[in-house]
């Protein structure tokens, strides 16, 4: 059966939420973030402003730029509304961030109805949130991801097959390939790889030897539309977790605590959404040196008590002896149970 994979991506998610809350901000250059830009409105992007840029640098490009503090709690609330809507359609969905995800439509939508479904999906999100999203549909996750970025904002693009995909991307800059960031792109330029089609002259063996197994295989396969990754939806749930990688590493304890609170809230809402209980917790950190550490704790009972889980997980986080800037933070609820009988309420004597 032909695979039908859809990728949705909310348009300038944080900035669009702030414009919704204050319509006077519409059509004005706006960024969300006090020190670092997390999201730039489309008006701000016209000045060359982008995420991960220092707000002070952004204001040099646009002196009239408006900077608004991050309100992760509100963004997560709206993200959960979107997730709940999608889960009413199918559980074959992989939420990869608050503002994007993959949906496996194979067997749900007929091939001839792909565009009609995408249009209805976008409109339903707009009705629910007054926000727009862009949708890409392809024959695998790679093609769907690239497709969703083509007609932003509020756009749709569909790749019917590998031939269609290769014809489109061949003349595009190599950075269109997921995993080819700014630094890797510069390395490729030194080797005279500027466009996607420049990769075709090299063998898989050469690319792996030159750039390493992971990067080499990704280049070779991606330019050919080859990607067999499954949409990793939750079947039988054993753990619920999330990780966040920071393009600007966390440097202070206050930054770490802020991001921990946000990540905990998002992950806890997934626990509640699935109506399950956790009896173990894990915290993971990765430094800029790429040293990675995890700490776990087995709880005496399975619970979904928010305050209890938060305090236990915060205690785990505080037990790390921080030795460097942090580029990744992850938290996980494990040993998942569905029965309420194993939970002891904290309002009773234990």
Language-model features: locations:
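Gly/Gly-Pro- and Ser/Thr-rich, intrinsically disordered tail segments characteristic of DNA damage-repair
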Residues: 1-216, 339-343, 347-350
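DNA-contacting surface of Y-family translesion DNA polymerases
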Residues: 7, 189-328, 335-343, 347-349
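Hydrophobic/anchoring residues in structured secondary elements
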Residues: 137, 331-333
């Amino acid at each position: 059966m032909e695979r039908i994979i859809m990728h949705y991506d909310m348009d300038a998610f944080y900035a669009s939420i702030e414009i919704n809350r204050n319509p006077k901000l519409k059509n004005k250059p706006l960024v969300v973030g006090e020190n670092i830009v997390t999201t730039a409105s489309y008006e701000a992007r016209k000045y060359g402003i982008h995420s991960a840029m220092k707000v002070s640098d952004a204001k040099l490009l646009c002196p009239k730029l408006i900077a608004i503090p991050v309100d992760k709690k509100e963004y997560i609330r709206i993200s959960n509304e979107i997730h709940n809507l999608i889960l009413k359609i199918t559980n074959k969905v992989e939420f990869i961030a608050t503002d994007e995800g993959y949906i496996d439509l194979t067997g749900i939508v007929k091939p001839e109805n792909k565009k009609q479904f995408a249009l209805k999906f976008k409109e339903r999100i707009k009705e629910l949130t007054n926000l727009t999203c862009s949708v890409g549909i392809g024959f695998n996750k790679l093609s769907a991801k690239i497709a969703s970025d083509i007609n932003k904002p509020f756009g749709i693009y569909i790749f019917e097959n590998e031939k269609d995909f290769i014809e489109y991307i061949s003349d595009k800059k190599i950075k269109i390939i997921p995993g080819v960031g700014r630094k890797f792109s510069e390395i490729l330029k030194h080797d005279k790889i500027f466009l996607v089609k420049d990769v075709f002259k090299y063998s898989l063996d050469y690319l792996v030897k030159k750039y390493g197994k992971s990067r080499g295989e990704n280049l070779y396969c991606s330019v050919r539309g080859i990607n067999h990754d499954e949409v990793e939806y939750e079947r039988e749930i054993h753990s619920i977790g999330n990780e966040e990688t920071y393009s600007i590493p966390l440097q202070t304890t206050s930054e770490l605590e802020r991001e921990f609170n946000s990540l905990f809230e998002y992950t806890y809402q997934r626990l509640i959404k699935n109506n399950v209980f956790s009896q173990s917790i894990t915290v993971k950190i990765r430094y800029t040196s790429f040293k990675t550490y995890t700490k776990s704790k087995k709880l005496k009972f399975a619970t979904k008590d928010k305050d209890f889980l938060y305090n236990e997980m915060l205690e785990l986080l505080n037990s790390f002896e921080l030795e460097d800037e942090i580029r990744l933070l992850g938290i996980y609820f494990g040993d998942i149970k569905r029965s309420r009988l194993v939970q002891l309420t904290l309002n009773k004597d234990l």
